[in-house]
């Protein structure tokens, strides 16, 4: 992935500050906007993992929205639509929630990839998310970076 100007990847020492996410194998990448402010810094997080369900892609996408709603009390989904660019079949979501009296906006690109079947293994599906979260007042200045960076993502299971 190529970061936009003004963004940087977390260094290993900073991962410890992520709490339980620090050891979560589904978290593949974390980037933050370079800012003088402390607290709610814009973040870009990529997660991915194998799906262990026979649910349809649409059901997987619907369940992933429910997981966001459960993880973020008060989360209000604003948009959820088919993403018209690559990766093919992706969904784009945007929503808002309040954390510690700060309005935060979350935008997420979600998609499913498949491995090719082999003689030893059937094809496998993987769910990926690229999520940008920032204070809502910064959203107009952050969204273009997120879209640009998301378009440079390449994932491997």
What does each model-identified segment do?
Residues 54, 102, 139-140:
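Loop/helix-junction capping segments adjacent to catalytic residues or to phosphate/diphosphate-binding pockets
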Residues 120-128:
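Short hydrophobic/glycine-rich mini-motifs in sensory/regulatory modules
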Residues 19, 79, 157:
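Short loop/edge segments at beta-strand edges and connector loops
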Residues 1-59:
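Secretory pathway targeting signatures of secreted, lumenal, and periplasmic proteins
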Residues 45-47, 96, 131-133:
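Residue-level recognition of well-ordered beta-strand positions that form the cores
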Residues 59-121, 147:
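Signature of long, low-cysteine stretches enriched in small and polar/charged residues
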Residues 50, 99, 114-115, 134-136:
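Beta-strand elements of well-folded, non-transmembrane domains
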Residues 7, 13-15, 127-157:
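Surface-exposed amphipathic alpha-helical segments
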């Amino acid at each position: 992935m190529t970061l936009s100007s003004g963004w940087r990847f977390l260094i290993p020492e900073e991962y410890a500050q992520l709490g339980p996410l620090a050891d979560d194998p589904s978290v593949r990448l974390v980037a933050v906007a370079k800012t003088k402010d402390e607290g709610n810094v814009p973040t870009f997080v990529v997660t991915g993992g194998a799906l262990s369900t026979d649910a349809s892609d649409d059901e997987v996408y619907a369940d992933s929205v429910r997981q966001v709603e459960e993880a973020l009390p008060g989360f209000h989904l604003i948009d959820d639509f088919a993403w018209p660019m690559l990766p093919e079949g992706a969904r784009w979501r945007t929503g808002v929630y309040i954390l510690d009296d700060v309005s935060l906006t979350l935008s997420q690109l979600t998609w499913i990839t498949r491995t090719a079947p082999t003689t030893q293994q059937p094809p496998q599906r993987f769910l990926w998310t690229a999520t940008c979260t920032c204070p809502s007042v910064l959203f107009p200045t952050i969204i273009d970076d997120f879209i640009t960076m998301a378009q440079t993502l390449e994932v491997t299971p």
